[in-house]
């Protein structure tokens, strides 16, 4: 397994619309394993393939258990997701490995139902609510070139742009 480089905003790569996965082979399995290792090392709960430069419609989500541990066997590998149903509305404070250090409230659906394939091309149905539903929406947005900061109000977006400029200045002076 290998750690992959996470692409950061404002890279144009993050605006790429990802392509459907058609080969469910050992290369795909390795990419998923590398994504998981990268996500855990970066202390994330979700990662879309485009965030590591792979323009493929696949993502992983691994929510921590009550003990705070993210067990590999609990990792959801979601490939070629399709929306079946969405319900309700919830505000959730989100962050993103591609937008490090910035967190903001975003409105999402409270419940979602998707169809997807696993690493073996088996079709699955998943119903989710709360944090898992939010994470699924956040990661599927990445597959469509959308970032959570795109969903902010004008005021919150200006705050984000200001904080980003300040962060970039600090990094230049290091």
From Swiss-Prot:
Gene: def
Single GO MF annotation: peptide deformylase activity
Superkingdom, taxonomy of origin: Bacteria
Organism, scientific name: Helicobacter pylori (strain J99 / ATCC 700824) (Campylobacter pylori J99)
GO-annotated biological processes: co-translational protein modification; translation
Entry function: Removes the formyl group from the N-terminal Met of newly synthesized proteins. Requires at least a dipeptide for an efficient rate of reaction. N-terminal L-methionine is a prerequisite for activity but the enzyme has broad specificity at other positions.
Name of the protein: Peptide deformylase
Binding site for Fe cation: 96, 138, 142
Catalytic activity, reaction form: N-terminal N-formyl-L-methionyl-[peptide] + H2O = N-terminal L-methionyl-[peptide] + formate
InterPro entries for this protein: Peptide_deformylase, Peptide_deformylase_sf
């Amino acid at each position: 397994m290998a750690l992959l480089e996470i692409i950061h905003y404002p890279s144009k790569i993050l605006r790429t619309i990802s392509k459907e996965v058609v080969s469910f082979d050992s290369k795909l399995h390795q990419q998923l394993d590398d994504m998981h290792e990268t996500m855990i090392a970066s202390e994330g709960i979700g990662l879309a393939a485009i965030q590591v430069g792979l323009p493929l419609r696949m993502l992983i989500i691994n929510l921590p258990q009550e003990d705070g541990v993210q067990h590999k066997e609990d990792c959801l590998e979601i490939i070629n997701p399709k929306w079946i149903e969405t319900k309700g509305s919830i505000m959730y404070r989100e962050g993103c490995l591609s937008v490090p250090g910035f967190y903001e409230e975003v409105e999402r659906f409270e419940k979602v139902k998707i169809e997807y394939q696993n690493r073996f091309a088996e079709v699955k149905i998943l119903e989710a609510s709360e944090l898992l539903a939010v994470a699924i929406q956040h990661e599927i947005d990445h597959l469509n070139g959308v970032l959570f900061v795109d969903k902010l109000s004008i005021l919150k977006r200006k705050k984000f742009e200001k904080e980003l400029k300040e962060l970039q200045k600090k990094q230049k002076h290091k």
